[in-house]
Amino acid sequence: MRETKVQREQLADVGDYLKAFACTAVMGQTVLSLGLTTAAGQAQRVPIAWLYAAIKFTAPAFICGILFSTMRTTIPRPSLTQYYRQQWHALGVPTLWWTLAYLLILPSVQQHQPARTVEQFLWQMVNGNAAPHLWYNTMMLQIILLMPVWWVLRQWATTIGRRKFLLESTTITYALGMWAYTYWIYDTARYGRWYLTDRIFLGFVPYAVLGIVLYLVWPRVRQWRWLAVPCLVFGGVAVGWQVHQLLQVQPLSLVRSSYYLPANVLYALSAIGLIVSLAIWQLRRQSRWLPVIHWLATYAYRAYLANVFWLTLIWSAFGRQLASRHVGWGLLLCYVLTWVWSFTATYLLHLTWQKLKTIILNWRNRKCHERNQSS
């Protein structure tokens, strides 16, 4: 049965689960990175490495979720003008404002070289160096701009043979890319200089393709009951593999973890599978969590943009002191407060902006009405 437009906009889907879990997990990555800046955190580097590896799936999951939800909610396909205008307001405007907030209010969180000239300032806005997490925006917006390509793939991959070819060709190409990255970049001095490779959309194309194919075969996938079992096995192996790689370098540096490494790719796919299996189970039961997941997914991107801003304030106010004394409780409290306030502030800002728009619109309508009456 085809979904109505209202149903497509209101029902939680697998994409919502992927986006909500990715946003929730990614906030922990920055918290753990800050924890390692303390002596107490370095003393607990092994559990921190395990925790970090367990939540290192967020960017692939978010891309997969975006593509799944977009494929589901863009039937019939909207005009490019309509789609890009909608994405500009939903993604572009929040990205612009939060990037400016980081550069102007918290310039200390800039990555690599801080901006000292106008040209460098503009470059920091574009390349994702304005804050530790904004590299993802640079990559994700490329995926969004390429949506016409993904629509063409959806229209083309309508048979089993074509979907099989799409998955196999993507897998082989990406495997060769991983080998080249590991051999020519990761294990060399180029790794630090070539950090912009993480911001190129090509490295995340497989997850976009996965989201498209997952949408196309969803009626069959939603019948699977044991998807979580192999995902748990492969995910456990991949986490251990990542931790082994991280702990080879002392002191522990989480920057050494790259989404382009085989262990990280295996874990990202396993984590996506686990989240999909949870979504299947809850969708089948019509869980009461569906509206909650949909709400979280709606505000996930904007909360993600804001999280480092609030975490920096929390860390400066009392987080560092608490984590230096009780690293576990300190990092947990910083994470919970960051998560709660990121979503709360995002929602309050949304309500405020909606109220302001209503006031402005009413004022304009009243002025137009008065002008028409006077004429």
Q: For each predicted feature, which ranges?
A:
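C-terminal "closing" transmembrane helix and its immediate cytosolic amphipathic cap
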Residues: 2-3, 280-297, 308-375
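Membrane-interface helix-boundary motifs at transmembrane edges
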Residues: 8-12, 74-85, 152-165, 216-228, ...
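Functionally critical transmembrane alpha-helices in membrane proteins and complexes, commonly lining
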Residues: 13-73, 91-99
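Juxtamembrane "helix-exit" motif on the non-cytosolic side of transmembrane helices
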Residues: 34-40, 108, 112, 180-191, ...
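Interfacial loop-to-helix transition and helix-capping segments at the boundaries
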Residues: 48-59, 125-139, 184-207, 243-273
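Transmembrane alpha-helical segments and their boundary/interface "anchor" motifs
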Residues: 52-61, 72-106, 114-132, 143, ...
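Hydrophobic alpha-helical segments with transmembrane-like composition
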Residues: 102-111, 115-186, 198-203, 208
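Alpha-helical transmembrane segments and terminal signal-anchor/GPI-anchor hydrophobic tails
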Residues: 219-299, 309
